[in-house]
């Protein structure tokens, strides 16, 4: 009889060993879709790479894996999970979209999503990285929980927009991150048009540092 718990424990040990070799792990998350989360993740990764850091990007948005599209490698297929796609000397990426047909939707339940995330984390050979940037799906679902449980020492960066509904969802994402013991680096207010007073009020409301997107570089 197969001991599933033993298999999961062994897989977790392998993931921990790989993650411990990576100096900085940042998960980019949002309370809702359409706020520029993926754009933020890839720009953060690219910005770090041109400064000389070794950076990997993991596309953990299983239902909408758009990282390859935004790096201009849409339709690219890989034969091995272990080999991330090299974008530049300092930047490589991995995504579920490298291993499934482009027009096939992912119709998976929670356990299947968690298994897929763990297989990616276990299988990818990042080699030496200064930063691993993880692009999470919007919301606070299974993928986010699986990443938090399997990437020790991960830091969270929350992306929002100035609309009230986005800010409310960001509050939920912030609470979720704290509940699952993610260290929150701060929040990026994308597509920003609010004044300094509003930013200060938002920081006070969320108890987290808020940066407008135009001030990232």
Q: How would you describe each model-predicted region?
A:
Residues 8, 131, 137-217:
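Conserved catalytic-core segment of NTP-binding enzymes
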